[in-house]
From Swiss-Prot:
Gene Ontology terms: cellular component: cytoplasm; cytoplasmic microtubule; microtubule; nucleus; spindle; tubulin complex
Binding-site positions, GTP: Q11, E71, S140, G144, T145, T179, N206, N228
Protein name according to UniProt: Tubulin alpha-1 chain
GO biological process, one term: nuclear migration by microtubule mediated pushing forces
Amino acid sequence: MREVISLNVGQAGCQIANSCWELYCLEHGIQPDGYLTEERKKEDPDHGFSTFFSETGQGKYVPRTIYADLEPNVVDEVRTGTYRSLFHPENLITGKEDASNNYARGHYTVGKEMIDQVLDKVRRMADSCSGLQGFLVFHSFGGGTGSGFGALLMERLSVDYGKKSKLEFCVYPAPQNATSVVEPYNSILTTHTTLEHSDCSFMVDNEAIYDICRRNLGIERPSYENLNRLIAQVVSSITASLRFDGSLNVDLNEFQTNLVPYPRIHFPLVAYSPVISADKASHEANSVQDITMSCFEPNNQMVKCDPRNGKYMATCLLYRGDVVPKETHAAVATLKTKRTIQFVDWCPTGFKIGICYQPPQQVPNGDLAKVNRAVCMLSNTTAISEAWSALDHKFDLMYSKRAFVHWYVGEGMEEGEFSEAREDLAALERDYEEVASDSLEEEGEEVEY
């Protein structure tokens, strides 16, 4: 089997994971105690979920996941919550003091004490897999544990499991509503560290998801649970083809092959459709054409940036539910006639399609309506560099006055790391600009190298 291990780091990572496992259990008919529901036992045994769950001798299913946080509060909620008997208690790892929003604490001082314990559990989990496919790492960019410990974990995974794919789901700091002052520092330091270790990073930003919840679901003041359930739908769509069968399956390595034209340019933009509230569901048609088109509207995208300002390099459309290949080809043909959707000229085809027949599931009494088909779009577009430039600008404002830098230096960081990380991100922005401007005339002049 092709197993996947999920690693959840820090508060954001652990809370997103809670919503994801809640949804996986519903999709596979697994109860909160890890045993199959009665209806599920009657059906044909489906081995798809062994990518995400391991089975014990008693017929209990245990998630292949590890929770790691430097402070115990969030993971304690898992230990006492509804799903407490689902997870293996040894795989819920917590420290005693948190990283206090400081990348250096998560990466150097506090994180160093915990990393070996986490890697030991990863090693045990990997040993029990027959064909480990790769890792999904969930963390935020802004927090101390998510940024610092997340980066440390990615570095160490590269050393121990060099060839395995590592996909990140990162919560990117929202442009307007920040949860901490030093978010720009943490984000840029962690991006610099993980840039060479991550194969593909799916970014979501809280502000964009707040807006989707407000606009499409009519929730006036969305909680983190509302946001995470929406993110869980996206993660579920991305991993559905690993867990269910479909006519066009996509595995972890295929994402990289189809979405990442150059190793550094690995930050696809995520969009999901349809997001409709239960009371509006009956009035929407939701044809394949409609949901495909709505993915290209900035309103349905999970990061605040405008794709109309950039060019698409590659796009992956993952359909699930009642969808046949013929309809998807028709939808893509229509997309290609739209003038607003511009592809770079060196990538003429640009669409990878995946279809999974399992319809999307919704959490009972949740915000999302039951729909019979959905699509998740992952697109590598040069517009996402807008997100970087906004963050770089904030970093520059603080760093020009060396504000808050002493907290990082006091935890054993060199001040040079800041400027090194900032230069790396400036280079990343330039990479995106070059890709966008690489028209064929310029190619002719640059043949020397």
